[in-house]
């Protein structure tokens, strides 16, 4: 969908200490090793979910590995990382990120991000707090063990 030929990917994550970040990387790597032999992960960096750090580290990553032609952002810091791509005039890089938030939407409209994986971050953030509040203030236990959010992939055409 996003690239043709050999794909040399860089992974930009928030922290190796955050389970959802490491799970995303593991799932990505497992899937590409099983099904997509033309995709190779070149390097992985951590940006502490910070746009300024992401800018510096993504710029250094791309300078050290000019053969990278795809970036997979597993956490925050996408805006800073994309600014690094732009600062190097790397229009050949395809970018995959998470969550349709104003920054990623803007970057998609500017044709910088190719696709985002949406997972309803507002619900993910507010639902646990609401459940905990209801339990602590009213003694209402959650009505089920797991709450799932919808996951979909957005490209410019279905943004």
Language model region names:
Residues 102-113:
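Glycine-rich, charge-decorated loop segments at or immediately adjacent to ligand/cofactor-binding or catalytic sites
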Residues 19-38, 57, 80-81, 124:
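Short, solvent-exposed amphipathic alpha-helices that sit
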Residues 1-8, 54-55, 104, 120-137:
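Hydrophobic alpha-helical segments within soluble ligand-binding/sensing domains
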Residues 3-9, 35-43, 68:
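Short, structured loop/turn "capping" segments at alpha-beta junctions
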Residues 12, 72-73, 154:
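Short hydrophobic segments within beta-strands
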Residues 8-17:
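Short beta-strand segments enriched in small/hydrophobic residues
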């Amino acid at each position: 969908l996003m690239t043709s030929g050999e794909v040399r990917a860089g992974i930009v994550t928030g922290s190796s200490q955050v389970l959802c970040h490491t799970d995303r990387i593991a799932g990505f790597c497992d899937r590409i090793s099983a099904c997509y032999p033309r995709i190779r992960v070149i390097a992985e960096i951590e940006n502490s979910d910070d746009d300024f750090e992401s800018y510096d580290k993504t710029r250094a990553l791309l300078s050290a590995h000019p053969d990278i032609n795809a970036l997979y952002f597993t956490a925050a810091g996408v805006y800073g990382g994309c600014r690094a791509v732009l600062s190097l005039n790397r229009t050949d890089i395809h970018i995959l990120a998470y969550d349709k938030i104003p920054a990623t939407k803007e970057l998609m409209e500017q044709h910088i991000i190719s696709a985002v994986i949406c997972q309803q971050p507002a619900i993910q953030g507010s639902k646990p707090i609401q459940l905990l509040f209801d339990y602590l203030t009213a003694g209402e236990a959650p009505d089920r063990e797991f709450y799932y959010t919808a996951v979909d992939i957005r490209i410019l055409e279905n943004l």
